């Protein structure tokens, strides 16, 4: 089974359009045979503090080489340096459904 890691800031069960969209993508991937592993990031995104950025970096660092990583756009755009540090090792995809 193929695995994808989905990084989402805050509470993915929140009743907003963005989180609903994320859940639909995760469900759709599951229906296509993917195992989707959710990783929660700090709720401070899209304005993360230093601790949130360190935690996001650590979350990416612990994932296996060549893993497929989907990052919600709310977090992705706020941590370009963190993402850039992992771009050679991971397969990174941004899910941008509401550009900031």
Q: For the regions a protein language model found, what residue spans apply to each?
A:
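Short N-terminal targeting/anchoring amphipathic segment
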Residues: 56-83, 91-95
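A short, histidine- and acid-enriched strand-loop-helix "catalytic/donor-clamping" loop
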Residues: 44-45, 95-100
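Short catalytic/ligand-binding loop motif for oxyanion handling, primarily in non-cytosolic enzymes
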Residues: 14-15, 47, 77-80
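N-terminal subdomain of nucleotide-sugar transferases
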Residues: 1-43, 63-67
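Short, glycine/charged-enriched secondary-structure capping and boundary segments
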Residues: 19-21, 52-53, 83-86
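A short, charged, and often flexible helix/loop element on the N-terminal side
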Residues: 35-63, 71-73
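Helix C-cap/helix->beta junction micro-motif
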Residues: 32, 88-90
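Short, flexible active-site-adjacent loop segments at beta-strand->alpha-helix junctions, enriched
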Residues: 10, 74-75, 98-100
